[in-house]
């Protein structure tokens, strides 16, 4: 289901000068023969970014997942890029979230970085994020203009690919703009904000239970803290209330 989008993502990264980097030992790929599930992951070194990760889970008709997060260099205070695409083939259900994830919720910060995403939401009104914002804390790492898609095969094959391509193009444009001007948030503060993002996300990651069910707790714990959110082990924080996707039933 998501292989064409995965190739589009990787192609766009290569065009921007990206090169693959080493994934921690044992985390590049994991397979569960009994459940016929396979997860593969990539790390990219991209000019202007300190880290760009991509993961693809293929569990046949049961579940398809494409996930990616891009972390800009600390001297660039632009939002992270985050996307989560899930397809439940047996139920013909799609859940997709695409967002520029803000480091802070300051009004001037949002005005400076989110004009492009605002325009995309106007261009794709069927992907308004109003519904999904009930599932997450809007005062943290989600923007008011995230693109949210829930539907069946028609949205998966029509609306999503077009929005996905436009979303990537918009983020690259934002990065090019920010690369030409000084960041307003000091690099040391951006670093702390990105660490806080990893901590926050690791504590609430809705996919951790899913990965555990397919690949076991030991592997999934390593995947969470060594690949998905590696900065989450570098500081302590108080456990928050759990959050989860509103997945199809």
From Swiss-Prot:
One of its GO terms (biological process) is phytochromobilin biosynthetic process. It catalyses: 15,16-dihydrobiliverdin + oxidized 2[4Fe-4S]-[ferredoxin] = biliverdin IXalpha + reduced 2[4Fe-4S]-[ferredoxin] + 2 H(+). Gene3D superfamilies: 3.40.1500.20. Keywords: Oxidoreductase. It holds the Pfam family Fe_bilin_red. It comes from the Bacteria. InterPro entries: DiHydbiliverdin_OxRdtase, Ferredoxin-dep_bilin_Rdtase. It is an enzyme of class 1 (oxidoreductase). Its EC number is 1.3.7.2. GO terms for molecular function: 15,16-dihydrobiliverdin:ferredoxin oxidoreductase activity; cobalt ion binding. NCBIfam families: PRK13247.1. Belongs to the HY2 family. Catalyzes the two-electron reduction of biliverdin IX-alpha at the C15 methine bridge. This is 15,16-dihydrobiliverdin:ferredoxin oxidoreductase. It comes from Prochlorococcus marinus (strain MIT 9303).
